[in-house]
């Protein structure tokens, strides 16, 4: 998707394209003397849903950690709105929501306390925790200790923050793990609403999606070869 920014001032129009929301430039990743991907380049624009796929060990998690700035590539760089993420770390982090394959839920806190903790840690003040949990089908579990919740409820507790975040870039590692079909559809609707508002979603998953159609989804396949 090419986003064109037009400035009308004194009857002058500029058709200069905006930089991509997130760009990978010639990324190479080597783990344990094995090349996972080599010279990988792509742009992710507002409105994009990108699924990273490939066999186990192909480098999916390594790639999304590099995109999130949590790992360094062997070579190449990642840019946010035209600047390398190393040069604009604060701005990039403020616009990024990353959820790893582990839900990151604290077992000694309740479901509501976990949502409050994560959103407050991200700088948010005005949010409706109960509404977020209800949207994730966790109404009635607000006060339940996370340590007593199922794996699917853990994942939903972690994902509840998506309801209130203002970050444009969502990077999610296996967000559908342990979630039933209804829960997957709830998340798909959330993804579609997010990209309709100018955000982007980057995810890994082994599950099929029923609401996000093929024409709405970009796929990036890692297969151990130079890309």
Curated annotation (Swiss-Prot):
EC number annotated for this UniProt entry: 7.6.2.5
Record's catalysed reaction(s): heme b(in) + ATP + H2O = heme b(out) + ADP + phosphate + H(+)
Compartment(s) where it occurs, according to its Swiss-Prot or TrEMBL record: Cell inner membrane
Family matches, as SMART domains: AAA
Keywords: ATP-binding, Cell inner membrane, Cell membrane, Cytochrome c-type biogenesis, Membrane, Nucleotide-binding, Translocase, Transport
One GO biological process term: cytochrome complex assembly
A Pfam family it matches: ABC_tran
InterPro entries named in the record: AAA+_ATPase (IPR003593), ABC_transporter-like_ATP-bd (IPR003439), ABC_transptr_haem_export_CcmA (IPR005895), P-loop_NTPase (IPR027417)
Main location: membrane
Gene3D superfamilies named in the record: P-loop containing nucleotide triphosphate hydrolases (3.40.50.300)
Enzyme class: translocase
GO molecular function: ABC-type heme transporter activity; ATP binding; ATP hydrolysis activity
Domain ABC transporter: 21-227
Binding positions (ATP): 54-61
Membrane topology: Peripheral membrane protein
Source domain of life: Bacteria
Gene Ontology CC: plasma membrane
Family of the protein in this entry: Belongs to the ABC transporter superfamily. CcmA exporter (TC 3.A.1.107) family.
NCBIfam families: ccmA (TIGR01189), PRK13538.1 (NF010061)
Subunit structure, interactors included: The complex is composed of two ATP-binding proteins (CcmA) and two transmembrane proteins (CcmB).
PANTHER family: ABC TRANSPORTER I FAMILY MEMBER 1
Protein task: Part of the ABC transporter complex CcmAB involved in the biogenesis of c-type cytochromes; once thought to export heme, this seems not to be the case, but its exact role is uncertain. Responsible for energy coupling to the transport system.
Protein's name in the database: Cytochrome c biogenesis ATP-binding export protein CcmA
